[in-house]
Amino acid sequence: MAEMSNYLENALINAVLRNTSYTSPATVYLALYTTDPTDADTGTEVSGNAYARQSITFGAPSNGVTTNSAAIEFPQATGSWGTIAYVGIRDASTAGNLLFHTALDASKTIATGDVFRIAVGSLSVTLA
């Protein structure tokens, strides 16, 4: 995942090149989308049916890459979440700002009773 949101791009430029402070979030969260969130944060995030963003723990970066150091598991869906085609990393458990986003390698339809999981090391963020 290397697609940064407009929000994060501007925050990093301001912090690195303009000496404007940026406060990193204490926790970041994975959000699931049925449409592309885009750099402008305009996608359709899943809602309802027991959906909630899940916190992510990342390991130390190496050569500009970091991966999740713990599995990410969403609650069991109590109804359809639709077809998940994109994920985003956000700075709050609700609302907040989109930081990174990407399309999944393969979309996944979540029906009643399904659980969406991402294994350790399967979510990566790359700055290049």
Predicted regions mapped to residue ranges:
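Small cysteine-rich, disulfide-bonded extracellular modules of the LU/uPAR three-finger superfamily
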Residues: 1-87, 91-128
